[in-house]
């Protein structure tokens, strides 16, 4: 699963997901794409699950670009731990997604195949998405 090789700081604040995505909201590499319609955190496992389904469905001949990367660490405290004694340890990585962000791009396949692959990948995502073309 995806995670940064190294970061400047081990832990981050949770932050807020206000507004829409101004960066990464256009198709750059392929002809078809899956675009987010809601704000959410998408985990590295969910990104990988979507990528696998698209590659499995598109088979050879198609190319896939993953346009998001999980660069935010999410911390968790051990179960049944009392309050206090600092912030928990990093457990997994997420990508902060705002509405309009392109998640995956596809090229080298027909629109029907790309649309079907995007629909299967959309089931793996915790948000509503839409299929877009250039």
UniProtKB/Swiss-Prot annotation:
Keywords: Chloroplast, Plastid, Ribonucleoprotein, Ribosomal protein. Its main location: plastid. GO terms for molecular function: rRNA binding; structural constituent of ribosome. One of its GO terms (biological process) is mitochondrial translation. It comes from the Eukaryota. Belongs to the universal ribosomal protein uL16 family. This is Large ribosomal subunit protein uL16c. The gene is rpl16.
